[in-house]
């Protein structure tokens, strides 16, 4: 079952002409280093050499370590003194390159929909930039780093894209198997190669890159609009609890009283635990309690008597001592959003009320929740 979606960034989620980006990037960087008395051509050559080394990295070091090793050994005068200057460029001037890009509302919509439905999302962008630069490129696409469960950068990657090692490392970090993933990108060579690992793929044909004129007719493909429709058709992975609104739950306005939504959250959470095979009754018999620390609810549209709603639930955080659950209430017939919310809980020893770490005291319950986080 598919539970993980990997996206390329440039030319996929972000509108970008790759050649124009490289030209603009080196033009701005060259101007900065020239203003400090350095030869831009020499520095650009050293950057290309370091980038090439990252693409061939064998996993023995991070791409960051690989890049600077080659850069420092490039023969540049005062090569080590250039690092603060390059750091300054990424922190202060790199963002001006956004002028050649534009955000895409569809990207925001797709990511939001996938997160809402419980999918793990990885940004499998070429890990040759530092995190600060990658996060800026994410912002250019109208997205945020928090939209992704993993973002590959030169700090956290040990291989270059599209090596098999790169993708296997991505899968390992996300805790996903190849057959559970879809890789989405606009590069026939660097993105579609994941099919050989057992992943499903989708080729975005806007800003298509096909350096070797490879026949790509066999791949699922289309525009970003086509992709949005393709992803929208993916099933909702969240646990779903069906509930008919009762007459006694309404208020004098004829709609469900606001406090009852909190009760529905609890009903859904209890049903979810039963579904996992370790209900609240079993947990209490094991001597564990799970009191509520916080609960929040936002109301979007009213529910009336006899309406049937679905309360969809997802585990969003688990530390071994605490967990956080998100909820979404929608009309079963129309899909209209009624309410959203979340609750946070801790774990305590019922006999004493003292906090406990499930990893130490109840590893079976701990692993149960860990498994849900890996989904």
Which residues make up each language-model segment?
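Asp-based, Mg2+/Mn2+-dependent phosphohydrolase catalytic module
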Residues: 1-5, 112, 126-128, 135-238
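Hot-dog-fold acyl-thioester-processing enzymes
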Residues: 236-294, 350-375
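HotDog/MaoC-like acyl-thioester-processing domains
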Residues: 237-241, 299, 303-305, 316-375
């Amino acid at each position: 079952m598919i539970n993980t979606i990997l996206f390329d960034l440039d030319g996929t989620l972000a509108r970008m002409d790759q050649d124009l980006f490289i030209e603009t990037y080196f033009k701005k960087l060259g101007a900065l280093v020239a203003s400090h008395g350095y030869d831009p051509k020499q520095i650009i050559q050293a950057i290309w050499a370091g980038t090439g080394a990252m693409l061939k990295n064998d996993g023995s070091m991070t791409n960051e370590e690989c890049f600077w090793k080659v850069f420092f050994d490039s023969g540049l005068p005062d090569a080590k003194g250039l690092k603060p200057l390059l750091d300054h460029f990424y922190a202060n001037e790199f963002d001006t390159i956004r002028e050649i890009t534009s955000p895409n509302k569809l990207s925001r919509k797709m990511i939001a929909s996938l997160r809402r439905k419980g999918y793990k999302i990885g940004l499998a962008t070429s890990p040759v930039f530092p995190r600060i630069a990658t996060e800026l490129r994410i912002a250019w696409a109208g997205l945020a780093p928090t939209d992704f469960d993993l973002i590959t950068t030169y700090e956290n990657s040990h291989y270059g894209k599209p090596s098999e090692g790169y993708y296997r490392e991505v899968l390992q970090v996300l805790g996903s198997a190849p057959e559970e993933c879809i890789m989405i990108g606009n590069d026939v060579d660097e993105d579609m190669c994941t099919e050989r690992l057992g992943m499903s793929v989708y080729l975005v044909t806007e800003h298509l890159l096909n350096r070797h004129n490879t026949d790509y007719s066999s791949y699922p493909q289309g525009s970003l609009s086509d992709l949005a429709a393709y992803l929208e058709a993916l099933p909702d992975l969240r646990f779903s609890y069906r509930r008919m609104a009762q007459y006694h739950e309404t208020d004098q306005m004829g709609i469900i009283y606001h406090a009852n939504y909190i009760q529905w959250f609890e009903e859904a959470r209890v049903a979810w635990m039963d579904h996992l095979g370790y209900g609240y009754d079993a947990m209490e018999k094991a001597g564990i309690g799970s009191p509520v620390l916080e609960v929040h609810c936002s109301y979007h549209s009213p529910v009336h008597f006899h309406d049937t709603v679905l309360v969809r639930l997802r585990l969003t955080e688990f530390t071994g001592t605490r967990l956080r659950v998100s909820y979404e209430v929608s009309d079963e017939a129309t899909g209209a959003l009624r309410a959203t919310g979340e609750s946070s809980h801790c774990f305590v020893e019922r006999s004493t009320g003292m906090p406990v770490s499930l990893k130490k005291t109840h590893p079976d319950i701990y692993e149960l929740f860990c498994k849900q986080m890996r989904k």
